[in-house]
């Protein structure tokens, strides 16, 4: 409903009535006069180029402008600079490109430092003694002594007759049972970890994109078309080259223990491998138990008479004989001349070696070997998948200063931000400007930088031990045992006739005999001559600086000096750097809207001069958060970020559990029997004594000293390698290692180039300033624009530094079961004869904990004169080095 005011019935100037509703649009009136030119506001900051949105529909026509007076077209004051808009959401994640070419394998790393020699294990307990052999048969009685002599008084006891000759040796007794195997020694500690190998070579870079197209000319703006349907997705771009793996992140906490793996099927035994090179000579192992009695070998040719055996046990005393007549004690005869030494008997041929004995007890663990060469570096792993969501955008950055408006040019690439110019002088305050429009919400800031790496986590608790594995299959039966221990020597038999000399026997094996008694100390040598005078000594070391003396007492305070003249004013100081910008204060409360003023008469003034630009209006209050805008086009891929600092060395993992014992090796071949020692010369028979009555049983004589050992024979050739034993069941799978840390977030790429600025349209007629309308409802977001074609893949960035070595994985669970022992190998051929001995006794020196040399004990050679020389067994040979 319209209301009218009749001015004819009122006096005075006409008063404005209330504003009526909007009428229908009338025909366009004549062009009005231009209004006064407004102040030119500062140019706004160029905004980020947005994505091309769909063309909007045409809005409804606005109300017609009120006819104004004839004036020049005015120019409204430019509004204040709007706040920066929100950054668009991240585009959809592109498809991952195929894996790049495989990098070449890295060069093999250097050998690690040799590990510390492990301590020698404790020797096993000795086996039980063998059963005693059967007693030898008593030899035949000696010939009776000559009778005669004067009859002595009754009841007297005759002198003891000469001892009968020794009977023949008895047959050897049965071998005693084998002693139990000694307990295995403790394993040596693990060697030091080798240094990591060199990093592999970087992969080949990807193929570069095509050449850049020529710059197109700027076309004339065409008319706006209707909104087209979204086009189909463009063809998928070529995948980019595989990037180098990023540096390793901070070590993550150890993951939970994995489930116990299923037991794998038993593997098939492998074929016999090629014969390996002879290993280094190890330390002598512990004595094995006595083996079972072997099958009797073929009887060899009669050998020469052996050395005199140990004295047998005396027989039980016989019944006392009848007392004989007392004989006359004859004078002792002079000792006869020494007999000539008989020809040495030729040693008989060695018998065939018996069947190999059963495997002996497990020897002590050998000295820990040097760690082998490090294998070649493994292939580079594929880059891990990105773990974790994209972080929220960081706070908004500070807006830069507004730039001046330039001429319209071709859209160029966005340049790097320039350095800030010096601060200009403060201008004169301009006239107060109009209230600025409400500012738009500020743009979201760039994402914050990557946080510092967290503290290294504590190592997790050790997992519980797994269940014991299933019992392994029963091993194959062992081979036949070796020859049993020889029985005790029987009584000495009568001397046999000298046999026919046999053919020369093969050189026997060198066996170390027992240590002979130490010789007596020789007489002291003559005194030496006086030596020449010694050379002049070196100058003594420089003396140390003495301690500083005690601090002296402070002297008395002096009198105060006269006051000096007052100084003049100094030169003015240099202009300081401008201080940092203060914090923006909180926005003040919005003022209350004043009542609308009366509409004044339309003025018709002359065009005034352009006034000074007014100060920038205060920033409006923050508006409501808008709905998310349409998804922008995907920006260019950012350059590769700088390589992160290499991570710190992770804590060493726990020591792994002890591995399963290896299978027993095939038993060694028994060496050839050494030659018997040379028979001693037979003494002359003494004069037969008188036949006396049997005397009391004499005490057992002391055993004679052992003769010198024969020269050691050359060792036999090593036997052929037996077939490898069946491989043991596969051990249970250890728990999975901890998951690696996620890589650092990528650096945000640079913004796309700014679009060309459109031509400024002509200013319309200035209408009356209406009342401020209510805030309209927020429009719905437009449809999403079509993604542009994917650009060519950029070249690969430089390879990042190699990350530190990861920590050791968690130890595996139970040990695998031990496989059965392989069958013994065939006996090897007899070795060639060895060189003659050097006159040294081979002595084994026990281990010493604190020895002056790294060998900590070993073997010594002792010469007949009592001196000792250390014998070092050179690896891979039987040479002996004397020290």
From Swiss-Prot:
In residue numbers, the region (Disordered) covers 1-883
Q: Gly residues: which segments have biased composition?
A: 147-161, 185-194, 285-297, 415-424, 445-454, 478-487, 564-573
Q: Where is the composition biased (Basic and acidic residues)?
A: 757-771
Identify its protein family.
Answer: Belongs to the fibrillar collagen family.
Q: Where is this chain compositionally biased, Pro residues type? A: 13-33, 821-836
Among InterPro entries, the record links this protein to:
Collagen, Collagen_Structural_Proteins
Its name, as the record gives it, is Collagen, type I, alpha 1b
User: Locations of Low complexity compositional bias?
Assistant: 34-57, 113-122, 129-140, 195-205, 214-223, 230-248, 310-326, 390-402, 425-444, 512-542, 574-584, 717-726, 742-756, 792-812
What superkingdom does the record give? Eukaryota
């Amino acid at each position: 409903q319209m209301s009218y005011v009749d001015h004819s019935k009122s006096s005075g100037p006409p008063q404005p009535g209330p504003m009526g509703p909007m009428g229908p649009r009338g025909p366009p009136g004549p062009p009005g006069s231009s209004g006064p030119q407004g102040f030119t506001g500062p140019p706004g900051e160029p905004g980020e180029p947005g994505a091309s949105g769909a063309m909007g529909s045409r809005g409804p026509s606005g109300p017609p402008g009120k006819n104004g007076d004839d004036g020049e077209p005015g120019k409204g004051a430019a509004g204040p600079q709007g706040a920066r808009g929100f950054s668009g959401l991240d585009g959809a994640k592109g498809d991952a490109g195929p894996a790049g070419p495989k990098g070449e394998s890295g060069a093999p790393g250097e050998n690690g430092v040799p590990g510390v020699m492990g301590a020698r294990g404790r020797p096993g307990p000795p086996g039980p003694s063998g059963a005693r052999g059967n007693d030898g048969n008593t030899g035949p009685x000696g010939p009776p002594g000559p009778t005669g002599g004067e009859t002595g008084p009754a009841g007297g006891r005759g002198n003891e007759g000469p001892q009968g000759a020794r009977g023949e040796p008895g047959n050897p007794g049965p071998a005693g049972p084998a002693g139990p195997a000694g307990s295995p020694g403790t394993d040596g500690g693990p060697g030091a970890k080798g240094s990591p190998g060199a990093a592999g070579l970087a992969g080949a870079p990807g193929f570069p994109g095509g050449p850049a197209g020529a710059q197109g000319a700027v076309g004339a703006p065409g008319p706006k078309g209707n909104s087209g349907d979204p086009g189909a997705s463009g063809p998928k771009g070529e995948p980019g080259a595989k990037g180098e793996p990023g540096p390793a992140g901070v070590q993550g906490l150890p993951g939970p223990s994995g489930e116990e793996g299923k037991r794998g099927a038993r593997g098939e035994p492998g074929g016999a491998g090629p014969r390996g090179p002879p290993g280094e000579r190890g330390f002598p192992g512990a004595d094995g138990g006595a083996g079972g009695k072997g099958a009797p070998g073929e009887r060899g040719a009669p050998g020469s008479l052996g050395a005199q055996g140990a004295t047998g046990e005396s027989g039980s005393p016989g019944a006392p004989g009848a007392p004989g007549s007392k004989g006359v004690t004859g004078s002792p005869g002079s000792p006869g001349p020494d007999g000539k030494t008989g020809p040495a008997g030729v040693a008989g041929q060695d018998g065939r070696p018996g069947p190999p004995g059963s495997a002996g007890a497990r020897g002590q663990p050998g000295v820990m070997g040097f760690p082998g060469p490090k294998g070649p570096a493994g292939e580079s792993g594929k880059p891990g998948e990105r773990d974790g969501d994209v972080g929220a955008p960081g706070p908004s950055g500070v807006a830069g200063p507004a730039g001046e408006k330039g001429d319209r040019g071709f859209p160029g690439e966005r340049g790097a931000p320039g350095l800030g110019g010096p601060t200009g002088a403060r201008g004169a305050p301009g006239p107060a400007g109009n209230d600025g429009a409400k500012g738009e919400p500020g743009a979201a800031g760039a994402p914050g930088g990557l946080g510092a790496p967290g503290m290294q986590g504590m190592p997790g608790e050790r997992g519980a031990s797994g269940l014991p594995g299933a019992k392994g299959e029963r091993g194959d039966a062992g081979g036949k045992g070796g020859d049993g221990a020889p029985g005790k020597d029987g009584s000495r038999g009568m001397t046999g006739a000298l046999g026919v000399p046999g053919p020369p026997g093969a050189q026997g094996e060198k066996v170390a005999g027992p240590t002979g008694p130490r010789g007596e100390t020789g007489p002291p040598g003559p005194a030496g001559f006086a030596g020449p005078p010694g050379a002049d000594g070196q100058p003594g070391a420089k003396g140390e600086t003495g301690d500083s003396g005690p601090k002296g007492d402070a002297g008395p305070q002096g009198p105060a000096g006269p006051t000096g003249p007052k100084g003049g004013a100094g030169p003015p100081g240099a202009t300081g750097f401008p201080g940092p910008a203060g914090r923006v204060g909180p926005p003040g409360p919005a003022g209350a809207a004043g009542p609308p003023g009366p509409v004044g008469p339309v003025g018709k003034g002359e065009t005034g001069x352009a006034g000074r630009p007014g100060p920038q209006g205060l920033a409006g209050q923050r508006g409501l958060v808008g709905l998310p805008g349409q998804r922008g086009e995907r920006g260019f891929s950012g350059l590769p970020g700088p390589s992160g600092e290499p991570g710190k060395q992770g804590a060493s993992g726990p020591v792994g559990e002890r591995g399963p014992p290896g299978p027993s090796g095939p038993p060694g071949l028994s060496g050839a029997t050494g030659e018997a020692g040379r028979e001693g010369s037979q003494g002359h028979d003494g004069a037969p004594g008188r036949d006396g009555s049997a005397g009391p049983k004499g005490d057992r004589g002391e055993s004679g000293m052992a003769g010198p050992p024969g020269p050691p024979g050359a060792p036999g050739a090593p036997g052929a390698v037996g077939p490898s034993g069946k491989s043991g069941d596969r051990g249970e799978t250890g728990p999975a290692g901890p998951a690696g840390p996620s890589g650092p977030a990528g650096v945000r790429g640079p913004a796309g180039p700014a679009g060309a600025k459109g031509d400024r349209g002509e200013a319309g007629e200035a209408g009356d300033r209406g009342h401020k309308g209510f805030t309209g409802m927020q429009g719905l977001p437009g449809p999403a624009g079509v993604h542009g074609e994917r650009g060519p893949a950029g070249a690969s960035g430089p390879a990042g530094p190699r990350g530190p070595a990861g920590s050791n994985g968690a130890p595996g669970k139970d040990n695998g079961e031990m496989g059965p022992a392989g069958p013994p190998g065939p006996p090897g051929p007899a070795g060639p004869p060895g060189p003659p001995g050097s006159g040294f006794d081979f002595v084994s020196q026990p281990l010493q904990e604190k020895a002056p040399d790294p060998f900590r004990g070993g073997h010594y050679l002792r010469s007949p004169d009592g001196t000792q020389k250390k014998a070092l067994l050179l690896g891979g040979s039987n040479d002996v080095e004397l020290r």
